């Protein structure tokens, strides 16, 4: 089975910078990484997956070592995740993809300005193994602490990372392989 990393987050949250950082720095040099963008957000992406009428259409693995699937940033995350689960059939013996990690990218200013977005993130974090905090420097530190508090208080089993102003993560391999404390 080919490992699949799923990226969640709204359009403009920093998903592209996170994907770039992971693709360039999370795996040993020479690994072939395939990027799967949702067809309507894909732009010039050579590969695409499609979410349509409640169904996910995901291409079969090729010769890549790992694939990164980016969900559509403007569509309902639960619907996409349920459709992906039905399509990928991770528990079935004939599954061709193995969901290795689910990563949410948080846009701090957007979440701070809109309570509904902050609640939307709670759904995403529920699914996630890792959370990348983006644009943290644009909001008060107290807001970030308050945002993270429920996850820390409830001992959410996911890792939290900061995406810096230059689009870097301190330890990219830990995002894909790290274990929560």
What does each model-found stretch correspond to?
Residues 1-46, 70, 78:
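Glycine-rich P-loop/Walker A and Walker A-like loops and their local beta1-loop-alpha1 context
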Residues 14-15, 40-47, 77, 112, ...:
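Short, charged/polar "capping" segments at the starts of alpha-helices
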Residues 32-86:
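Conserved nucleotide-sensing/catalytic segment adjacent to the nucleotide-binding pocket
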Residues 65-66, 70-86, 95-115, 136-142:
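Conserved Switch II/interswitch segment of TRAFAC-class P-loop GTPases
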Residues 101, 129-130:
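Well-ordered beta-strand positions
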Residues 116-121:
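Charged helix-capping and loop-helix junction motifs
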Residues 139-181:
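C-terminal accessory "lid"/substrate-recognition subdomains
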């Amino acid at each position: 089975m080919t490992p699949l990393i799923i990226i969640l987050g709204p359009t403009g949250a920093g998903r592209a910078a996170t994907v770039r950082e992971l693709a360039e720095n999370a795996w040993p040099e020479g690994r072939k990484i395939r990027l799967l963008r949702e067809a309507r957000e894909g732009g010039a992406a050579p590969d695409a997956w499609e979410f349509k009428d409640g169904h996910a259409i995901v291409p079969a693995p090729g010769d890549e070592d790992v694939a990164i699937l980016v969900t559509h940033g403007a569509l309902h995350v639960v619907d996409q995740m349920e459709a992906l689960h039905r399509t990928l059939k991770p528990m079935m013996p004939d599954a061709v993809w193995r969901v290795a990690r689910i990563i949410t990218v948080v846009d701090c200013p957007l979440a701070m300005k809109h309570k509904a977005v902050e609640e939307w993130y709670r759904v995403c974090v529920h699914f996630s193994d890792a959370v990348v905090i983006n644009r943290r420097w644009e909001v008060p530190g107290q807001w970030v602490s308050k945002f993270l508090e429920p996850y820390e208080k409830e001992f959410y089993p996911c890792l939290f990372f900061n995406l810096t102003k230059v689009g870097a993560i301190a330890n990219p391999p830990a995002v894909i392989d790290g274990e929560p404390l």
